[in-house]
Amino acid sequence: WAAANGITAGTSATTFSPDQTCTRAQAVMSLWNAAGKPTPKSMNNPFVDVSEDAYYYQAVLWAVGEGITNGTDDHHFSPNLTANRAQCVTFLYRYVGAPAVENKTTFADVPATAYYADAVAWAAAEGVTNGTSSTTFSPLMNCTRAHMVRFLYNYFAK
């Protein structure tokens, strides 16, 4: 589904590498591709670590313009840092407009006060994720390429 719809490419012509970790750049790029590669609202780049020739340049500018990410601080996006599961679900949650959720305590390892609590509760309610077990989401676990594709597939292909 992801390859056929241009959401992500493999790590080679014949390999997807599902267990390879997903960087912040890859996560935002995959979401941007799934959203149809919309034009960024602004070409103003606030990040010193996102160059104009980076493959993810427009995806990051789009994500910033849509309020999907603010970066890791005011001047850094940290594109090569490994994204965790909480960040990836939060990107998708913000993409859909951060709808209100009623139950923030879906998983035992997601504190109700965590920045990602609403995102995880929304993702569970919408079938985007069923966690890493019936009681855990593992928010700080590295997000793999397979996790990211599964989150996107469960939202966009339903």
Q: Model-predicted segments: where are they?
A:
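Feature responds to low-complexity, polar/acidic, surface-exposed segments characteristic
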Residues: A9-A25, N33-Q58, T69-A86, R94-Y116, ...
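Phosphate/pyrophosphate-binding loop motifs in nucleotide- or prenyl diphosphate-using proteins
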Residues: G6, G67, G127
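A short amphipathic alpha-helical interaction element
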Residues: A2, L31, A63, L92, ...
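The feature marks the first
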Residues: W1-T11
